[in-house]
Amino acid sequence: MAKKTIKDVDLKDKKVLVRVDFNVPLKDGVITNDNRIVAALPTIKYVIENGGKAILFSHLGRVKTEEDKAGKSLKPVAERLSELLGQPVTFVPETRGKELEDAVNNMKDGDVLVFENTRFEDVDGKKESGNDAELGKYWASLGDVFVNDAFGTAHRAHASNVGIASTGIPTVAGFLMEKEIKFIGEAVENPKRPFVAILGGAKVSDKIAVIENLIEKADKILIGGGMAYTFMKAQGYSVGLSLLEEDKVDLAKSLMEKAGDKLVLPVDTVVSKEFSNDAPFHTVPSTEIPDDEEGLDIGEKTIELFANELQGAKTVVWNGPMGVFEMSNFAKGTIGVCEAIANLEDATTIIGGGDSAAAAIQLGYENKFSHISTGGGASLELLEGKTLPGLASINDK
């Protein structure tokens, strides 16, 4: 997946459009976590240092009606960015119009501008998320070069990524996007072996396509989380009150047949009568889950089994928790697996976003992984072997 990057274009005196991912959590107008802004800094600084004018834009939350706009402005983001960069950042409170055009035309080399939430264009006919050609053309007209650095929306064809790129403007990847393509793309297309995938989370249905694609690619697939119970049921075991997708049992059976001994399931399970951190819990073999209890985590023996399967791995991709990670009594499986991956030597270790990323960060292991993906949905689709529209629209090298 050889794509042109920001280093392949001359930025001096150029108006550089940068689609960033500034979709940060806001509470009462205050940013509660600025990770995504921090993650975009290398690309933004590169534009500034190389004499370009940085015109930044992003979506923030979902906006369908006028009322939805409340609390979704990028203004607090522009203010935080200014603090992080140590220089003024101009904020333009519109997505198109004279004020925006004038502000862009008045920029000097090294200046930074942020314009309003791209999804404000969805209020009147889904122009952003429907990839309205006219809107893409308008945004493209504001710049000379387009840098797509928003991997989190790479699996969507929106006006602010695909729409702009399809006008023919030179389109390259920013540093964040480049890193995602390098790590996840490589793992799927050309992994160093042995390649072990660890999949968790609640539903088999969310991961079917990933499992199908990885059966061909991975040497082992370790399954934990709520989705494991559908596989156990497919083996003919009772799963008690555990999360179960009845309509996916036959599919789980056929996936197991296809995978053979590549697929590894939990050998023991932590069960409880209630979905509560205060309820008593104990560990049983996975083949003996009581009818009146539900599985909420993988047991100690499974943590050990998974850690053994990981020994010697050269590429590891982890997506999804092993249990109900939000409850401390049922977080041990996720923590155990996270530690086992973090302590591997000489392996490329990748977390595919979402809850697994939160777990690694919470445990202070973020620097022990080769790569923690910024895009949950996008990284899943890449693991499924799909072509992502946002990636496809970046110029090839």
UniProtKB/Swiss-Prot annotation:
Pathways per UniProt: Carbohydrate degradation; glycolysis; pyruvate from D-glyceraldehyde 3-phosphate: step 2/5
Enzyme class per UniProt: transferase
PROSITE patterns in UniProt: PGLYCERATE_KINASE
Residues the record lists as binding substrate: 21-23, 36, 59-62, 119, 156
Record key words, sorted: ATP-binding, Cytoplasm, Glycolysis, Kinase, Nucleotide-binding, Transferase
Quaternary assembly: Monomer.
Protein name in the entry: Phosphoglycerate kinase
Originating organism: Enterococcus faecalis (strain ATCC 700802 / V583)
Phylogenetic lineage: Bacteria, Bacillati, Bacillota, Bacilli, Lactobacillales
Gene: pgk
